[in-house]
Amino acid sequence: VKTTISTFLNDLAKEWCATRPIVSFAYENRIEQDMPVAFDSALKQMICNVLDNALEASPQWVSLEATREADALTLVVTDTGPGFAPAMLAQIGKPYQSSKGRPGSGLGLFFVVNVARKLGGTVTARNREQGGALVQLTLPLAAISLEEETPHGD
């Protein structure tokens, strides 16, 4: 889908919030320089998976913050849930790693990590000092940009 970073994220945040039973969703789009991009359903699903995991751990409050730093889009999802167990943090991105104990669990973050890697991005997870979890997605703008590259002459 051809759009801009801000339009895509604003629409995604609005749709996600409207279709989930969340008490408080703090969304902050701090992208100062918007740009045309192409987002596909895998990118949307990737972001929604992280938000859904946060919601399951923290139904009262989830936060999504978007920033553009140099040549990367950074999305940070935080919650006030119990955080990650140390064993889970060591296994982030591996299939079937879940704290939910249900068949089929544990593919959400595996999917997230694989989509990010295919785009040359990264996913990091940690526990917040004040409690809860933080997951950061960093995607290179070159992987999603619609802007033409200008050839460099030698």
Labelled PLM ranges:
Residues 61-71:
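Short beta-strand/loop element within the Bergerat-fold HATPase_c
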Residues 79:
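Acidic ATP/Mg2+-coordinating residue in the GHKL
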Residues 84-96, 152-153:
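Short conserved segment of the HATPase_c
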Residues 108, 112:
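Short alpha-helical Gxxx[C/S/T] motif in the catalytic ATP-binding
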Residues 22-38:
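Conserved catalytic submotifs in the C-terminal HATPase_c
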Residues 1-21, 47-48:
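Short beta-to-alpha transition helix within the HATPase_c
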